[in-house]
Structures are given as C-alpha cells and as structure tokens.
C-alpha cells in the first residue's frame, strides 16, 4: 500500500510539472513588430542546419531576400528557430514555426547578443505571402498554437492578415522617425 501511495504521489508531482513546458507569448501588434525588429524581409526560406545552445536545439533557415523593408541583410540572411533535430535528438517548442522551402514569407526578425537572428515573437513575426482575387499582395499569419497575452490578459489568437502596401507604409514611417 505504501508503494502504491508513493507511486501515486510521484505521478501527481510529474503531472504538476507538465504546464511548465508550455509556451506563453506577449501579443505583438504590427507596430510592435515593425518598431522592435532588427530587420523585415520578404524572402523564400530553405533549411540549412541545426545547432544546440544551452540545451536548446535550433533550426537555422537561410532566407533568399527579394526585398528588405528594414535593416541591411544583403541577398541572404539566416534566422534560427527554436526546435528541430540535432545529432539524433529532437526537440519541439510550442508556437515555434517551421518554414517550408519554396514558400515566400515576410519575416520580422531581431538579432541577439551572439549575432544570431530570430523571428519576432516565435511565429508572430512570420507571414506567408499571398495574392487576393484582385492581385494585391496580402500577408497572412497563422493563428498561434500557444497562449498569447495582451494588455487585457489572455486573448485568443486568430491569426492576422495584412496588406503588403500597408506594411511598406508603416515601415517607411518608422524609418523616418
């Protein structure tokens, strides 16, 4: 009986730790993304490699830049995304995006102290490029699979659609300040 009680206590203790693995994000508005990012690029991505830093695995994507709205990335820029495969280990991070080769994106990124670039707010800074029926370029961000908190507390995330021209104007205004 004592063994069963100890087993149950251990199981409950482990279950209590499960929520600690969740990802919680602060909601970033388009103005936040524009203002706080190091760079904004329209680009096509390809996975390059993975690495491990402080126990966390990252996948690095090389972005073939077609246009830069902020920063000076050159023809290519690399961004690291939490999660991936490294030396036989796999790590998943809730809310971390996986870029698909051949898909055109607009990516808001920031540069860390080590010089590594990261997508803003995990997937919040990643938009797929599409054209609407009239031919106008629109950017779509998928709904986040993690908890997102705004000024009023927890808010459901439904994704975001933004017109390319609108983003160009916002980025130009911010650059002029």
For every predicted segment, state its role.
Residues 1-10:
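Bacterial N-terminal signal peptides that target proteins for export
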């Amino acid at each position: 009986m004592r063994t069963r009680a100890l087993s149950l206590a251990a199981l409950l203790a482990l279950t209590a730790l499960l929520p600690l693995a969740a990802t919680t994000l602060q909601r970033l508005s388009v103005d936040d993304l524009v203002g706080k990012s190091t760079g904004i690029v329209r680009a096509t991505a390809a996975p390059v490699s993975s690495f491990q830093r402080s126990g966390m695995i990252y996948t690095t994507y090389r972005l073939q830049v077609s246009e830069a709205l902020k920063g000076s990335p050159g023809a290519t820029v690399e961004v690291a995304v939490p999660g991936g495969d490294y030396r036989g280990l796999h790590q998943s991070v809730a809310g971390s995006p996986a870029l698909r080769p051949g898909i055109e994106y607009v990516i808001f990124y920031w540069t860390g102290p080590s010089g590594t670039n990261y997508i803003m707010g995990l997937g919040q800074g990643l938009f797929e490029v599409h054209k609407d029926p009239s031919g106008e370029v629109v950017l779509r961000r998928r709904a986040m699979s993690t908890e997102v908190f705004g000024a009023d507390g927890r808010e459901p995330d439904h994704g975001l659609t933004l017109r390319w021209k609108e983003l160009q104007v916002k980025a130009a205004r911010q650059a002029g300040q």
